[in-house]
A protein has these predicted regions:
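N-terminal beta1-alpha1-beta2 submodule of the flavodoxin-like/Rossmannoid cofactor-binding fold
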Residues: 1-86, 91-102, 106
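A short helix->loop->beta-strand "cap" motif at the edges of active sites that frequently abuts
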Residues: 2, 123-126
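Short histidine/acidic/glycine/proline-rich micro-motifs that form metal-
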Residues: 11-13, 134-137, 170
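Hydrophobic residues at beta-strand termini and immediately following loops
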Residues: 38, 130, 164
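Short, well-ordered beta-strand core segments
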Residues: 82, 127-128
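Short, acidic/small-residue loops that bind anionic groups at enzyme active sites
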Residues: 104-119
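Short, conserved loop/helix-junction motifs that constitute active-site signature segments
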Residues: 118-124, 156
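Glycine-rich phosphate/pyrophosphate-binding loop and the adjoining helix
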Residues: 138-173
Length: 173
C-alpha cells in the first residue's frame, strides 16, 4: 500500500479551516493509502541553533544518518505522497512548519550534494499544500508560502506540486 505523510501545522486543531480542507481531501484517500498523520504542534521540534545545529552537522559529517534525530527526514524521504496543511501567517505559514522543514532537509537522506549540483532523494512524486487565508492573496507577490513549498519540492526531487488555497475567509463586504 502506498504511503502518505500528512504534515499538519494547523495550530487551531479541529477548529482550523485549513484542517477541514485537508480532512476533506483525506476522506477520499482512506482506502488507497496508509496515512501517517504528523501533528506538528504535538512534536518536540527544535530549531537548528547552537548545540542542536552543531550535533546535526557532526552526525552528517560522520555519515551517521541512522541517528534518531533524523527521523523526520527518513519519514519524508520514504513516502509516496506528501500533504502539508498550514494556515497563512505573516505572508507565509507558521514558523513551526519551517522548523520541521529544517529538520527534514538532510544531505544524504532527502537530498544529495553531487559533483553536478544538488539532487533530490525523496521517493514521493506529489506534494499537496492546503491553506486558508483571511484576505485575498492567491498568486499575490506578498504570498511567500506557496512559491517556497514549490521550490522545496524541486529541491527534494518531488516532481509534482499542487495547492488549494481558500482565500478571503475573513473578508466582510
Amino acid at each position: 500500500m502506498k504511503k502518505v505523510l500528512y504534515v499538519d501545522c494547523c495550530i487551531r486543531g479541529e477548529e482550523s479551516r485549513t484542517k477541514k480542507i485537508a480532512d476533506a481531501f483525506f476522506a477520499n484517500l482512506c482506502d488507497q493509502y496508509e496515512v501517517k498523520h504528523l501533528d506538528l504542534k504535538n512534536e518536540n521540534l527544535k530549531p537548528l541553533v547552537n548545540d542542536f545545529f552543531d550535533e546535526r552537522e557532526k552526525l552528517i559529517a560522520e555519515h551517521n544518518l541512522t541517528h534518531p534525530r533524523f527521523r523526520y527526514a527518513h519519514e519524508l524521504a520514504d513516502v509516496d505522497m506528501v500533504v502539508i496543511a498550514a494556515p497563512f501567517y505573516d505572508l507565509s505559514f507558521p514558523s513551526l512548519l519551517k522548523i520541521y522543514i529544517e529538520n527534514c532537509t538532510v544531505d544524504g537522506i532527502t537530498f544529495a550534494s553531487t559533483s553536478t549540483g544538488l539532487k533530490g532523494l525523496c521517493k514521493a512524486t506529489n506534494m499537496y499544500y492546503f491553506t486558508s487565508r483571511g484576505g485575498f492573496y492567491h498568486n499575490a507577490a506578498d504570498e511567500q508560502a506557496t512559491p517556497y513549498l514549490k521550490h522545496l519540492c524541486n529541491f527534494l526531487g518531488i516532481d509534482h506540486f499542487d495547492y488549494i488555497d481558500a482565500d478571503g475567509m475573513d473578508v466582510v463586504d
